[in-house]
A protein has these predicted regions:
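C-terminal ends of transmembrane helices
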Residues: 4, 54-64
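N-terminal membrane topogenic signal
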Residues: 5-20
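Structural signature of hydrophobic alpha-helical transmembrane segments
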Residues: 16, 37-50
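Cytoplasmic-side transmembrane-helix entry/capping segments in multi-pass membrane proteins
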Residues: 65-77
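Pore domain of cation channels
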Residues: 164-219
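Short, hydrophobic transmembrane alpha-helix segments
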Residues: 28-41, 59-61
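Pore-domain transmembrane helices of cation channels
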Residues: 92-130, 135
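Membrane-proximal soluble regions of multi-pass membrane proteins
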Residues: 126-185
Length: 219
C-alpha cells in the first residue's frame, strides 16, 4: 500500500493534536502572572480536565460529544489567549515590565496563537476529523492545499492521488498566516475559515507591531 493510500484510508493521528494542546498549557504556565487571566494554573488545569474526557469519548466512539468537547477546549484556550494579549498590550505603554520579559511573553503568545488556530482549522474543516475519516475524500472542503491544485492525471506522479490533510498541514497554514499576516500555502474556501484567519492575523499583528514598537522605543 502506498503512502498516499495510507494517508487517506487510515484515521488521522490524534497524538499531534494532544501534544499541541498540552504545549499550550505549558506555554501558559511559563507566562508571567501579570499576563494571565486568573491564576497561572487555571488554564492548564482546565485543559487537563477537559482533555481526558475528550480522549475517552474518542476511544468510545462518542463522536458528537468528542467534537463538542474539542470545541469547548478550543474556545477556552482562545479566550485565554485574547485575554493575555490584551494584558500584554496594556503593559507595553506603561513600561512597567522589563523589555526582555515583554519580548519573551510576546513570543510565547505568538506561538500560542499559531497552535490555537491550527486546532480550530483541524477541528472544523469538513465537519471535523471524525467526519473526514468517514468520508475518506481527497483533499479538503475548506482550504485549497497545493496537492489539490495538481492535475488529476499528474497526482500519481507525486503520490497524492488519495491525499488529505492532517494536523501538521493545518499547523503549517496557521504558522504561515501568523508569519506573513495572510494565507500563503492554501487559499481559503469556507467563510468560517476566512473569519478565523482574520482573527488570527489581527492577534499576530497586534503582538508583532507592539513588540517591535516597544523594542525600538517608539512607545
Amino acid at each position: 500500500m502506498s503512502d498516499s493510500t495510507e494517508h487517506v484510508d487510515q484515521p488521522e493521528p490524534r497524538w499531534q493534536v494532544i501534544l499541541a494542546v498540552v504545549a499550550i498549557g505549558g506555554i501558559y504556565l511559563a507566562l508571567p502572572p501579570w499576563f494571565t487571566v486568573g491564576p497561572t494554573w487555571l488554564l492548564p488545569a482546565l485543559i487537563v480536565v477537559l482533555l481526558i474526557p475528550t480522549v475517552v469519548t474518542h476511544r468510545m466512539g462518542r463522536h458528537s460529544l468528542n467534537h463538542a468537547l474539542g470545541i469547548v477546549i478550543n474556545a477556552i484556550i482562545t479566550l485565554a489567549l485574547i485575554g493575555s494579549v490584551i494584558l500584554l498590550v496594556g503593559a507595553i505603554p506603561v513600561h512597567k515590565q522589563a523589555p526582555l520579559s515583554l519580548l519573551l511573553s510576546g513570543a510565547e503568545l505568538w506561538l500560542t496563537n499559531v497552535l490555537v488556530f491550527a486546532l480550530w482549522y483541524w477541528r472544523l474543516d469538513g465537519g471535523g476529523p471524525t467526519v473526514r475519516d468517514r468520508r475518506r475524500e481527497f483533499g479538503s472542503r475548506s482550504f485549497v492545499f497545493p496537492q489539490m491544485q495538481i492535475e488529476k492525471i499528474e497526482r500519481g506522479r507525486f503520490s497524492v492521488e488519495r491525499w488529505r490533510p492532517n494536523f501538521v498541514d493545518y499547523l503549517f497554514i496557521a504558522f504561515t498566516t501568523s508569519s506573513t499576516f495572510g494565507p500563503t500555502d492554501a487559499p481559503l474556501l469556507a467563510r468560517w475559515a476566512k473569519a478565523l484567519t482574520m482573527c488570527q492575523i489581527f492577534i499576530s499583528l497586534s503582538i508583532v507591531v507592539l513588540l517591535i514598537s516597544r523594542a525600538v522605543g517608539i512607545l
